[in-house]
Each structure stands twice: as structure tokens, then as C-alpha cells.
């Protein structure tokens, strides 16, 4: 079930705008859910779930300058999407996905993290501290204290923009993409900033700040307080990336035609993913991987 309302226009043969609002209800979505082991199977995949997506798309384009020898244009698009789980399976309102840090709950967006909240390292003894479900500090880690933390795996905002420039035979184009509001668990830090693995894995320079004596203010706890998969590993993975950069030169037709063999020729350079701006410390904010 989909409702779309949009408008598309071009003004002065130079400005173009497309705007669309949508409301999509998707039913009978494929979903894997657990079965009793007495059935002989651990899980089944069936058409049982429902989800609603609401948002808008906007696309803009501007021909800034256009003459016989010179042209310059810019374009961009922006999407906002808010999803909501409206139905699970067997009448359940919530279901935790094992070992993922994610929980599905009717009325919540798909992809909101469900973790125990890390509260820092106690400078008195170097032990990790967490918040329990009631917001009280504790040094005892329990997955029963996991809550929705208001951070999503999937970015609600995404888009891109680009520019094209041409002067005589020279052409330059650049395309960028971005995502805003997405978070990722930096699994690498569990190994590279963890005293437990200091003897077997490469460690980051952050390990030089590990707690050693009372009064030390740090986020690397003593080896006596094991690290856990909690919110301190969640990082803002919003990013802007230059996806493509193309620089080219089209040889003058008069020069090419003198060869008597070819009618046109173009020399160009293409670069991909040349620049990424992000606060995420992992390998790639677009790839959820432990590599």
C-alpha cells in the first residue's frame, strides 16, 4: 500500500525541482523467526512481518552558466525516511535478535540499537561502570539491563550532490554522497583497545592511557574489568564521501580528423572514493564488517 504526492517543475529553463512525499505500508514481509527445536528446525522464514515507511525525496538541479564554450551545473538530492515496525510474528510485540545488539519492537524503527549503556571507567579503581535499566550505576554487567539507546543502524537522512564543469574541450565532474544519523558498532575496537587481547592482537595508542592508579581518568579500564559489547563501542558513522571525480579532455575534431582513422577521442582520469569525511574510526562507514 503506497501513497505518493509529488511535484516536478522547471523554471526559466535553468532550475529544476522534484519533490515527493510518500507513505508506504508493506505487509507480509519475509522474516526469519525461531521455532521450537521439537520441530526439527531452529527457525523458519515466512511472510509474517509488516512495516511502514514515511518520508520525502527532493531533487534539485541548476544550470549556473551555459555558453558556447563554458558550462557549469550543480545538482543534489535529499531523502528522509522514518520506518516503523507495525507487526511481528505469532502476536509478539518484540523480539531480540541474538548477538546483534538489535531488537525489533512494534512501534519502534527497525535498526535501533538495544545495548547496555556504558557509564565510563571509575577513576578510583579502574573498573567499567554501566547504567542498569533504572538508570542506576553498577559495576556488574548484565544483558538484562539493555535498553533502546535512540541510535539507529540505518541513516534516516541520505543524499548526494554533484557538479559538472566544462570549458572548451576540458570537463570536470564530481559526485558526493552522504548519510546522516547512522551509527555502527566498531567491533575492531573490542580487540584493539582491550587489555584482554594485548598479548595476541595489535593495539591502538589509546592503550597507553589504560588505567594504572587511582585518579587516572581514562576510557580504557583495568584488565581486571573485562570489556563488553556495549554503547561505548557505538560510533557516529555519518559521513560525506566523494564517490567519483572525473577529469577529461576531448581532443579537437580538426586534429583527430587529420588522422583519417578515428573521428573523435577523449582522454580522461577517474578517481573513486578519493575523500571521506566521518567521525567513524572503523574501516568504512558504508560497510558493516569486522575485517
Which functions belong to the PLM regions below?
Residues 1, 48-54, 108-110, 151-156, ...:
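Short sequence motifs at beta-strands and strand-loop junctions characteristic
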Residues 14, 65-72, 85-90, 253-267:
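Short loop/turn motifs that connect adjacent beta-strands in outer-membrane beta-barrel proteins
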Residues 3-9, 15-23, 56-64, 72-80, ...:
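Membrane-embedded beta-strands that build the outer-membrane beta-barrel scaffold
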Residues 179-272:
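Extracytoplasmic gating/loop element in the C-terminal half of outer-membrane beta-barrel translocons
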Residues 46, 63-153, 272, 279:
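Conserved small-residue
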Residues 29-33, 37, 80-98, 181-209, ...:
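Outer-membrane beta-barrel and related beta-rich outer-membrane complex signature
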Residues 1, 20-51:
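Solvent-exposed loop/turn elements at secondary-structure boundaries
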Residues 33-43, 136-145, 217-231, 287-291:
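Flexible, solvent-exposed coil segments and beta strand-coil junctions
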Amino acid at each position: 500500500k503506497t501513497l505518493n504526492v509529488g511535484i516536478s517543475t522547471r523554471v526559466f529553463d535553468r532550475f529544476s525541482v522534484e519533490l515527493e512525499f510518500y507513505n508506504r505500508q508493506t505487509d507480509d514481509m519475509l522474516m526469519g523467526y525461531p521455532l521450537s527445536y521439537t520441530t526439527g528446525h531452529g527457525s523458519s522464514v515466512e511472510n509474517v512481518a509488516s512495516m511502514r515507511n514515511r518520508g520525502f525525496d527532493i531533487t534539485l538541479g541548476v544550470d549556473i552558466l551555459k555558453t558556447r564554450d563554458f558550462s557549469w551545473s550543480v545538482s543534489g538530492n535529499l531523502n528522509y525516511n522514518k520506518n516503523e515496525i507495525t507487526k511481528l510474528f505469532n502476536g509478539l510485540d518484540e523480539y531480540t535478535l541474538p548477538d546483534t545488539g538489535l531488537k525489533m519492537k512494534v512501534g519502534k524503527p527497525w535498526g535501533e540499537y538495544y545495548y547496555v549503556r556504558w557509564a565510563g571507567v571509575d577513576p578510583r579503581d579502574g573498573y567499567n561502570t554501566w547504567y542498569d535499566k533504572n538508570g542506576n550505576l553498577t559495576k556488574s554487567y548484565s544483558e538484562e539491563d539493555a535498553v533502546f539507546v535512540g541510535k539507529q543502524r540505518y541513516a534516516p537522512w541520505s543524499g548526494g550532490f554533484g557538479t559538472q564543469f566544462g570549458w572548451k574541450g576540458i570537463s570536470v565532474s564530481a559526485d558526493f554522497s552522504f548519510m546522516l544519523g547512522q551509527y555502527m558498532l566498531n567491533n575492531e575496537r573490542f580487540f584493539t583497545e582491550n587489555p584482554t587481547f594485548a598479548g595476541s592482537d595489535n593495539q591502538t595508542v589509546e592503550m597507553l592511557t589504560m588505567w594504572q592508579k587511582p585518579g587516572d581518568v581514562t576510557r580504557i579500564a583495568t584488565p581486571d574489568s573485562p570489556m563488553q559489547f556495549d554503547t561505548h563501542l557505538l560510533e557516529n558513522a555519518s559521513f560525506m564521501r566523494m564517490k567519483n571525480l572525473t577529469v577529461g579532455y576531448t581532443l579537437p575534431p580538426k586534429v583527430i580528423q587529420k588522422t583519417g582513422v578515428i573521428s573523435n577521442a577523449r582522454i580522461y582520469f577517474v578517481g573513486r572514493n578519493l575523500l571521506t569525511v566521518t567521525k567513524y574510526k572503523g574501516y568504512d562507514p558504508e560497510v558493516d564488517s569486522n575485517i
